[in-house]
Structures are given as C-alpha cells and as structure tokens.
Amino acid sequence: MSDALDEGLVQRIDARGTIEWSETCYRYTGAHRDALSGEGARRFGGRWNPPLLFPAIYLADSAQACMVEVERAAQAASTTAEKMLEAAYRLHTIDVTDLAVLDLTTPQAREAVGLENDDIYGDDWSGCQAVGHAAWFLHMQGVLVPAAGGVGLVVTAYEQRTRPGQLQLRQSVDLTPALYQELRAT
C-alpha cells in the first residue's frame, strides 16, 4: 500500500460525511496491552488502516462479534480460539460516545466508495485500507462497517482523531477459553 491518497476516493468519502455513533463495544488484547491503544494496528496495519501511518483501535459492537474476531485471529495463527486463549488475553468493555464515523454499513454506502463484499470479507485489505486512509486524512474519527467475520459491526476508531472521553474503558476481564465459549454461544 502506498502512502499516496486517491483524490477521487477522498472526494467521494468527503461527500458521504460522517454520522455520530455511540455504543458499548468490546475488544480483546494481550493481557499486557493498553485497551485504548491502536499502536499494534499502526505497526502492522489492519483492514482499515495501512501499516506505519496512524494508530487504529478496532472495536466490535457485541461480545459475540468480538469472539468471532478471536476465532479469526486463531485461524490465521493455525490454531483454535481455545488453544490461543491459553495465553493471557483480556476482554475489554469500552463505551464509545459521539464518534464521527464514516458509515459503511449499507451496500449502497460501500458501493459509493468503491468497495464490494469481497473487500469487506476477503483477505485483500488494500481497498479497505485506502478508504480508511482517506477517512483519516479527512479527520474522520473512524469507520463503521460490517464485521469481516459476518457477525455484527466493527468500528475502527482513529486514535489520534478521538477527543478525550469519547472512548472510555468500563471493564477488563480475563478472556479465558470458558468465557470465550460462553460469549460465543450467545
């Protein structure tokens, strides 16, 4: 992914504008990671942020959607969620308040910015990263999208764009294999 922006894409995203979004969200991290840091995504990149450009905090709109993301991470590491969670992980409950996000929850919204379902659910992140980069460039605070795992929504909050108090850590608990199974079943 190049650091260059596609001007046409920037204009299409700017024309869509943002919505204010508030929700209780969930995120899992390694036990010693900061729940409200997007540094890992900055270093390695994520679906909605290219590597080495800006930090992004990935949040699921339900505990079940978060557990699907745990499954996806385990599959990418060629293991099971239960085996992966034998290491120390934490599940964080985070309150999101009035985050100005690019809403890509409808097929029409995604089409308007040049994304297809394969971009959302597939393994090639380049289209999503280009959209995320443009949204960040426009000082949007994040993007709201269907979760790649097919359950719920994900909001990617751009850490440098959020204001104090917009992301509030409510609770952190150990994410054990037993808790994973309980939450995945709901």
Swiss-Prot record:
Outcome following mutation: R47A: No longer toxic
Consequence of gene loss (knockout): Not essential, it can be deleted. Deletion of the mbcT-mbcA operon has no visible phenotype.
Biotechnology: Molecules that disrupt the MbcT-MbcA complex could be candidates for anti-tuberculosis therapy.
Keywords on record: NAD, Nucleotidyltransferase, Toxin-antitoxin system, Transferase
UniProt xrefs under SMART domains: RES (SM00953)
Pfam families, per database record: RES
Induction of synthesis: Induced by hypoxia. Expression induced in both active and resting C57BL/6 mouse macrophages. Induced in persister cells. Induced by streptomycin treatment and by starvation. Induced by starvation stress; probably part of the mbcT-mbcA operon.
Catalytic activity: phosphate + NAD(+) = ADP-alpha-D-ribose 1''-phosphate + nicotinamide + H(+)
Assigned EC number: 2.4.2.-
Gene Ontology MF terms in the entry: nucleotidyltransferase activity
Subunit comment: Heterotetramer with 2 subunits each of MbcT and MbcA; the tetramers further assemble into trimers with 3-fold symmetry. The antitoxin acts by blocking acces to the toxin active site.
Described function: Toxic component of a type II toxin-antitoxin (TA) system. Neutralized by cognate antitoxin MbcA. Degrades NAD(+) by phosphorolysis. Expression in the absence of its cognate antitoxin MbcA causes dramatic reduction of intracellular NAD(+) levels and is deleterious to cell growth, causing cell death. In a SCID mouse infection model, mice infected with bacteria overexpressing this protein survive longer. Overexpression of this protein in a mouse infection model at 21 days leads to bacterial death, and shows a synergistic 100-fold increase in mouse survival when combined with isoniazid treatment.
Listed name of the protein: NAD(+) phosphorylase MbcT
Record organism: Mycobacterium tuberculosis (strain ATCC 25618 / H37Rv)
